[in-house]
Amino acid sequence: MFEYPQGYKLIAGVDEVGRGPLVGAVVTAAVILDPHNPIEGLADSKKLSEKKRLALAEEIKEKARAWALGRAEADEIDEINILQASLLAMTRAVKSLKIQPHFVLIDGNKIPKDLAIPAQAVVKGDSLVAEISAASILAKVARDQEMEELDKQYPEYAFAQHKGYPTKLHLEKLAELGALPQHRRSFAPVKKALEQF
């Protein structure tokens, strides 16, 4: 059981999706839930079916007091590394909220330095904290939709299937077709593909 910090009225949960993929942005979400408007079935986005995630994402957007997305693009990831880019994207999500929270709960073990709001990192927060679960669902749905859009542009890479993660199929496509502008140049398999072409 997670114990919420005491004395804070508006608490935001923050999570990121897309640290592991070789392509595209790392996407984050920040969510302030409404205690008078509970959402059933919130869980870590990775443990939910796509259908369930999509339904919950709509419900979160409808019922949350505030929600926002943040992102760091592939070129930013290459410039400052994936961890720093994830933290930057988290800060962007929090700053984009229409209501500023009094406290922020962040999935993982790191807190962005420039948040300027009291915060706590929660390991396995996406399973323990409803606000972080909600954020993980919004971020995952948003990023998956981006991969589906990329798939329409470059169907030969099968992005809708692997969502940019370094699966056997994605690595085969990289070796065969080379890297796209959206690929993260600092990631080893992409570097290798760039050297071959």
Swiss-Prot record:
GO process terms (BP): DNA replication, removal of RNA primer; mismatch repair
Q: Which reaction does it catalyse?
A: Endonucleolytic cleavage to 5'-phosphomonoester
Q: Where does a divalent metal cation bind?
A: D15, E16, D107
> Could you tell me which Pfam families the record lists for this protein?
RNase_HII
Q: What range(s) does the RNase H type-2 domain occupy?
A: 9-197
Keyword list, A-Z: Cytoplasm, Endonuclease, Hydrolase, Manganese, Metal-binding, Nuclease
Under Enzyme Commission nomenclature, its number is: 3.1.26.4
Protein's UniProt name: Ribonuclease HII
Q: Which organism is it from?
A: Haemophilus influenzae (strain ATCC 51907 / DSM 11121 / KW20 / Rd)
